[in-house]
Amino acid sequence: MFDYKLLSALAAVVEQAGFERAAQVLGLSQSAISQRIKLLEARVGQPVLVRGTPPSPTEIGRRLLNHVQQVRLLERDLQTLVPALDEEGLPERLRIALNADSLATWWAEAVGDFCAEQHLLLDLIVEDQTVGLKRMRAGEVAGCLCASERPVAGARSVLLGAMRYRALASPAFIKRHFPDGVRAEQLPRTPALVFGPDDFLQHRYLASLGVDGGFEHHLCPSSEGFIRLTEAGLGWGLVPELQVREQLERGVLRELLPDKPIDVPLYWHHWRNGGQLLGLLTEQLVRSSAQWLVPLD
């Protein structure tokens, strides 16, 4: 039998990115957390954590974390059927990885009423849509919104739709860098805005226009900051259409190459044995996402 106090310690260390915060969340001392991790490692006969900054799970650690995630969700189902088992009456929590642009646009409206009705709290982890699945693979989250269709072992994926991005810049930026009109081959020689080192959307966009190679760019790991920097004329950027309709109407931002958007698919990944709550959340996302996402051709 598993000792779930030990597994909870492992989950807390990974989820809270360290022993100190894990101790605070569980109401224990750091030494107690460390002792539980050592005891768990003694029981399984191998390390469950790589002691780094932050600590990361080993292969067996990931398997144990996956197990903990699914047990938490199944326990919630049982408590719904037998309310007497839910002695504390605390709201359920789900850890979910998603991309910053979804969080800044449609996510809140899609899940707001659902979370209120289900008495659900969310722990949201922001990751680029191309790499968020690593959190799922590590057993750190119960669900993941990302651009990859292929699920990890033990999970399912469902296509929700696509976020449409447009290449935009301020009128002053366009006048300064493209006085004779915008041509695709000029883009690599003008400053761009990129969300982070894992963001390759600009590379894909330029490749779709037949333009290869590197390009000058700023790094801005904030969806809101990305818009502000674009408006201020620091560079051109690929921006979610959902996020800038007002700016386009007012002429604060303009499209560099009209009718040449790029669509990024969004897949919802969730554990197969995630219980009723995760199933209901999946149904809610499938049902509501069509209001904001475009169909994928």
Curated annotation (Swiss-Prot):
UniProt xrefs under Pfam families: HTH_1, LysR_substrate
Protein's UniProt keywords contain Endoplasmic reticulum: no
GO MF, one example: DNA binding
SUPFAM superfamilies to which the protein is assigned, alphabetical: Periplasmic binding protein-like II, Winged helix' DNA-binding domain
InterPro entries assigned: ArgP (IPR017685), ArgP_gammaproteobact (IPR023490), LTTR (IPR050176), LysR_subst-bd (IPR005119), Tscrpt_reg_HTH_LysR (IPR000847), WH-like_DNA-bd_sf (IPR036388), WH_DNA-bd_sf (IPR036390)
Keyword field: DNA-binding, Transcription, Transcription regulation
DNA-binding region as annotated in the record: 19-38
Residue ranges annotated for the HTH lysR-type domain, each copy included: 2-58
Entry similarity comment: Belongs to the LysR transcriptional regulatory family.
Function comment: Controls the transcription of genes involved in arginine and lysine metabolism.
NCBIfam families per the UniProt record, alphabetical: argP, PRK03635.1, PRK13348.1
Assembly behavior: Homodimer.
Name of the protein in its database record: HTH-type transcriptional regulator ArgP
Gene name of the record: argP
